């Protein structure tokens, strides 16, 4: 059964390649510096193809590999992938466990390619809430790619916008309480320094793979 599903998956990709051939790449001045992708709709895509949801998630991993290679080739500075949100914990536990197994497998299997292609892996979100084995592989990959100077591939894991706002607010308040920052000095840069994405370039392009708005 699994082999039939894998064959069907390969056939779908063969019919619809992820990236068209670019006759003339965009000039560097027009290339987005920071691209973010909300990775949703994988399960629905699989259902539309007559496959089970987990095959949709596997297809998503294949897409990540292609997108990462592409962004590296056209010299995008940062690629953020919103891979697992705080809302995703509400999914069936069997599906959640599969997603983390898939993430762990990705971190292990893609490590050599990330290193070879000068890609630096980073991560944002409440990472301590992830399974211990996933945290370990994530940290190992981050450590091994830390000195790479090419594409910054940032995985948003256990991420929620409200969590980020709360975390940033607490960080600013702690600086005020310790005397490192006065209330009058609270401005946009001070808040940006406390965001999960501190140090990353401003977002230029946001893509939601499910097509929702």
Question: What are the language-model segments listed below?
Answer:
Residues 1-213:
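Flexible, compositionally biased loop and terminal segments
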């Amino acid at each position: 059964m699994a082999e039939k599903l894998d064959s069907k998956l390969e056939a779908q990709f063969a019919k619809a390649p992820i990236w068209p051939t670019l006759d003339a790449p965009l000039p560097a001045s027009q290339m987005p510096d920071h691209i973010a992708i909300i990775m949703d709709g994988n399960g629905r895509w699989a259902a539309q193809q007559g496959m089970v949801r987990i095959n949709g998630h596997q297809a998503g991993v294949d897409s990540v590999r292609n997108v990462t290679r592409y962004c590296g080739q056209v010299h995008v500075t940062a690629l953020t992938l919103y891979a697992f949100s705080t809302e995703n914990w509400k999914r069936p536990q069997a599906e959640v466990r599969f997603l983390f197994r898939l993430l762990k497998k990705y971190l292990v299997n893609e490590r050599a390619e990330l290193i070879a292609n000068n890609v630096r892996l980073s991560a944002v979100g409440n990472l301590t809430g992830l399974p211990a084995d996933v945290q370990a592989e994530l940290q190992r990959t981050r450590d091994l790619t830390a000195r790479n100077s090419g594409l910054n591939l940032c995985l948003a894991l256990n991420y929620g916008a409200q969590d980020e706002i709360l975390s940033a607010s607490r960080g600013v308040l702690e600086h005020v309480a310790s005397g490192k920052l006065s209330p009058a000095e609270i401005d946009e840069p001070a808040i940006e320094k406390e965001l999960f994405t501190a140090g990353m370039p401003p977002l230029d392009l946001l893509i939601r793979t499910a097509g929702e708005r």
